[in-house]
């Protein structure tokens, strides 16, 4: 009797990949962005990545040790969170602030909700948003590659009124101000290609998000070039590839992924063009995370052969 088949409605998810294997692939995919940050902004960028990652791992280990929970440091999820969180900061960020962000991401967002698989939103995303809301001036102190790390806040491509004046190659290669992980489009695309090639993620969500922003921006501005610059600027690409695709907080059905991608792209566009902020990707992903159960429900496939029960006629025999 122990070998009975369990019959349930679709979708049926079959995957032999381990959490450690999947997270390991994400770490590898993030390496081009880490190396690009080091080349563009210098050694301090690598130090910030290392400290933030170590802090995330340490907080996870200490929390599980104190509460006598199974140790999950080996699944590399804390490492992924640390790298993504660090790449969502400007290079001049004080290390103690990075540690605070790591605490918010690991302890508050992840562990207090039950650990990996139970968090309501991407931990690194929440860490970024909390730091941005509490330390806006620090989080927007962008540094150009040829400036000192203690320079004052500088404009990013999103803040430039006439984006047609921006050199496409400079934006693509990362010769501009911004968060460490978002400036080099080439590095992000290399990571994206690796994730898709290894089937760690599907291309549906990132492509849908970017396509939505591109189309809406082109229609609103009347310029495909401006739309292209906007898609390559800010946290759109980095967020679409590495944050919106989080396994726990993104839909698992194909239709659900499409709804989710369009929703995030739409909210990002609305915040950028009609809100008070230049960037809206983080808030769009957070709202998308919260909407994921509904996207899964809307995208749920009806089981083969399913027939909707007929309503009993009034006054009929019971």
List each model region and its residues.
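Long hydrophobic alpha-helical segments that form multi-pass transmembrane helix bundles
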Residues: 117-189
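N-terminal signal-anchor module of multipass membrane proteins
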Residues: 1-53, 57, 312-318
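Loop-to-transmembrane alpha-helix initiation sites
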Residues: 120, 124, 228-236, 257-259, ...
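Structural signature of hydrophobic alpha-helical transmembrane segments
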Residues: 42-55, 92-101, 171, 175-185, ...
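C-terminal ends of transmembrane helices
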Residues: 58-70, 106-117, 188-199, 241-250
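Conserved mixed alpha/beta catalytic, RNA-binding, or beta-rich assembly cores of soluble enzyme
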Residues: 196-223
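Membrane-interface helix-loop-helix junctions at boundaries between adjacent transmembrane segments
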Residues: 77-78, 83-149
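Alpha-helical transmembrane segments in multi-pass membrane proteins
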Residues: 25-33, 48-60, 77-82, 86, ...
């Amino acid at each position: 009797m122990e070998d009975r088949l369990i019959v349930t409605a679709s979708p049926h998810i079959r995957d032999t990949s381990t959490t450690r294997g999947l997270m390991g692939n994400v770490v590898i995919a993030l390496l081009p962005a880490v190396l690009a940050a080091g080349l563009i902004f210098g050694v301090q960028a690598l130090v910030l990545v290392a400290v933030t990652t170590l802090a995330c791992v340490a907080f996870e280990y200490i929390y599980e040790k104190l509460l006598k929970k199974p140790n999950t440091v080996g699944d590399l999820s804390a490492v992924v969170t640390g790298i993504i969180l660090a790449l969502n900061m400007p290079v001049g960020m004080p290390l103690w602030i990075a540690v605070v962000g790591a605490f918010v991401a690991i302890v508050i967002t992840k562990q207090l909700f039950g650990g990996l698989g139970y968090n309501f939103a991407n931990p690194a995303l929440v860490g970024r948003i909390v730091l941005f809301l509490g330390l806006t001036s620090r989080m927007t102190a962008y540094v150009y590659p040829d400036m000192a790390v203690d320079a004052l806040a500088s404009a990013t491509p999103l803040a430039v009124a006439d984006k047609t004046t921006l050199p496409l190659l400079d934006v693509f290669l990362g010769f501009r101000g911004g968060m460490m992980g978002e400036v080099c489009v080439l590095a992000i695309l290399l990571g994206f290609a690796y994730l898709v090639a290894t089937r760690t993620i599907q291309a549906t969500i990132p492509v849908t998000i970017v396509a939505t922003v591109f189309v809406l921006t082109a229609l609103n501005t009347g310029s495909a070039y401006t739309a292209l610059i906007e898609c390559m600027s800010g946290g759109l690409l980095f967020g679409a590839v590495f944050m919106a695709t989080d396994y726990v907080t993104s839909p698992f059905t194909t239709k659900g992924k499409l709804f989710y991608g369009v929703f995030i792209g739409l909210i990002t566009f609305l915040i950028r063009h009609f809100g008070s902020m230049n960037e809206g990707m983080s808030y769009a992903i957070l709202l998308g995370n919260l909407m994921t159960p509904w996207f899964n429900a809307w995208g749920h496939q009806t089981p083969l052969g399913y027939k909707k029960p007929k309503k009993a006629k009034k006054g009929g025999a019971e």
